[in-house]
Amino acid sequence: MKGSRALLLVALTLFCICRMATGEDNDEFFMDFLQTLLVGTPEELYEGTLGKYNVNEDAKAAMTELKSCIDGLQPMHKAELVKLLVQVLGSQDGA
């Protein structure tokens, strides 16, 4: 549990840093980031969502560890997170 909290803190910190550093739609960035964490690969994070940032090796290692934790979730739990993401994305489209 302690490791999970640390990984969540890393993800939130990364999100906050990127959110402050960009002028793009922050919600869109965050949703793309979450979607890639749930169903993408670490490489897709660096090439896509985080592509315009210089991600150092320690941050890459942290992201890989976070992705590994997400990939280790029970399939039904991961599916529920994906459904929640789809629901949130759908509500943003209608707004």
Swiss-Prot record:
PANTHER family cross-referenced by the UniProt entry: SECRETOGLOBIN FAMILY 1 MEMBER, SECRETOGLOBIN FAMILY 1C MEMBER 1-RELATED
CDD domains noted in UniProt: Secretoglobin
Compartments in which it is found: Secreted
Leader sequence residues: 1-23
Listed name of the protein: Secretoglobin family 1C member 1
UniProt keywords, alphabetically: Secreted, Signal
InterPro entries xrefs: Secretoglobin, Secretoglobin_1C-like, Secretoglobin_sf
Cellular component annotations (GO), alphabetically ordered: extracellular region
Record PROSITE patterns: SCGB (PS51311)
Pfam families: Uteroglobin
Domain of life where this protein originates: Eukaryota
Family: Belongs to the secretoglobin family.
Main location class: secreted
